[in-house]
């Protein structure tokens, strides 16, 4: 299977299946000298691990990370950083029935058609647990970028019909509720909505939003390495994501040039913008203002409600999916979205080092 790697210099390769022995990641291109320990990674993995509220799968996994290579005496060595999380609470018997039919909303049919074979236990490679490797790699990227003053604020913007009210936005509230919403009133309404979904054996989708501050001007390259294009690829590669928009996104299509353009102004002796309809990018490069994007996440496809499908013999059947599944993916996806954004920014930053001859000259003059 191709396609398990992402990035150019800061390159991430994930491996493992939901019900295999474990899952992990190899991260190439991590600069030497970054202080790093397993706790730095664990903090991020704890944000995505299951069993933390009634709105996540009851599958209990510690998701404890082990760093296998690339770190010595508390610092990265510049060699590949390899990490693993061992699976401990697989219940593969919950999935024995689905080997013979195709679950609506899942990749079962496509896997069978493409490869002629699939690991049906928990979705195998297409399981949400694949994101463990992404989050572990993203934790490294976030630590690397935070040392440069680049910060990430990622949260749940909406769940089903419930959207946060900008007037009530409180960043401190994000970690005060299990839905990671920066609006306590919206979080309460969303919880009530999800309770109804659970009662009706159904699930819900939602939207994650990410705001990145402290970015320099010029990350990303015009044409095929645009920062917004690479972010779109990174975010859309997350299994449940079905849409991506940056800045005003699709609303820009309803605007005029005069209302959509961000006027430039001088502020504190530097070029700035009056507004940020562009979401922090121009011409495929960061423009120094906050980079803002959103990811639309579909409802969990594994639901207990009766659904129509077909089996591998081509017969029409009805199914009710058993097992341990999230009624909503969004809260656990928040950190995955942040991780993929950080990986993309870290890669763009390292690629940017060779953009100008004067920077290369200045560097080598010091040697």
Curated annotation (Swiss-Prot):
Pathway in which the depicted protein is active: Metabolic intermediate biosynthesis; chorismate biosynthesis; chorismate from D-erythrose 4-phosphate and phosphoenolpyruvate: step 7/7
Q: Which UniProt keywords apply?
A: Amino-acid biosynthesis, Aromatic amino acid biosynthesis, FAD, Flavoprotein, FMN, Lyase, NADP
Question: What EC identifiers does the entry list?
Answer: 4.2.3.5
Please identify the protein, giving its name as recorded: Chorismate synthase
Gene Ontology biological process: amino acid biosynthetic process; aromatic amino acid family biosynthetic process; chorismate biosynthetic process
**UniProt-annotated binding residues for FMN:** 125-127, 283, 298-302, 324
- Enzymatic reactions: 5-O-(1-carboxyvinyl)-3-phosphoshikimate = chorismate + phosphate
* Role, per record: This reaction introduces a second double bond into the aromatic ring system.
